[in-house]
Amino acid sequence: MLKQMFDQVREKSPLIHNITNYVTVNDCANMVLACGASPIMADDKEEVAEIQTICAGLNINIGTLNSRTIESMKIAGTRANELGHPAVLDPVGVGASTLRTSTANELLKAVKFTVIRGNISEIKTLAVGTGTTKGVDADIADRVTEENLDEVVAFVKRFAGRTGAVIAVTGAIDIVADAKKAYCIYNGHPMMSSITGTGCQLSALTAAFVTANQEHPLEAAAAAVCAMGLAGEIAHERLTPQDGNATYRNYIIDAIYHMDGNELEHGAKFEVK
């Protein structure tokens, strides 16, 4: 299943419209290229509807919000829905400020998202209006562990049912779920948290995967999360004592570039609940 998801990305090379944050925009573009898709980074309200029309999927990331891009996100999201394009929302830091929270909620009302990806604190904030967001990282009280895994899976499935979206909760244990089925994913490496933007890259990667596999959004999102985690493992094995987080970031992108469906199929670590 995972092999097919990745192979479809390489075969179809979908064009993905990214309205993302300026901290990680270059990394997101390179991640989309590395997986075999193509990126466009456009965020002016005068062109986003037109750009979305020529694309096949949309990735919206609220990491560096401003009044100009908020309007652009709504326009692009509405156009994506009109065209039947998959849309991914990355609600970076929702709950940390009133602007982020209100914008994320407005986007959820205005746009039908295929996938919503965030850490557990961000997803909790969207789902119940509360959470313990501190910046863009999940508070220790909100971490997914083996002990609370079943409880979190049930919560994520409920939120998926309410939104109609696949929900991807990423952390030490990743959960990707729709209302009925959840993938609990164990790929990744702790050093990935030392890089700014691995989550942003994953959302861009997810947009490419779900766009190339529109009939299987749950499996496509799970494949993207597995691929990113596996890339983190492969990249870490390459590091020398002189290397740091900048080298690690590049190695993760390289790992996706060289990865194929067979490697993903054999390297993925997950269980289904």
Protein language model annotation of sequence segments:
Residues 100-182:
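Conserved phosphate/ATP/ADP-binding segment of small-molecule kinases
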Residues 28-31, 203-210, 221-224, 252, ...:
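Buried hydrophobic packing segments
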Residues 230-273:
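Charged C-terminal helix
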Residues 196, 206-248:
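Conserved post-catalytic alpha-helical subdomain immediately downstream of the catalytic base
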Residues 69-118:
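Glycine/small-residue-rich loop that forms an oxyanion/phosphate-binding "nest" at active or ligand-binding sites
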Residues 186-196:
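Short pre-catalytic strand/loop immediately N-terminal to key active-site residues, enriched for Gly-Thr
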Residues 1-41:
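Glycine-rich phosphate/adenosyl-contacting loop at the front of the ribokinase-like
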Residues 31, 35-84, 89:
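Active-site cofactor/substrate anionic-group-binding motifs, chiefly glycine-
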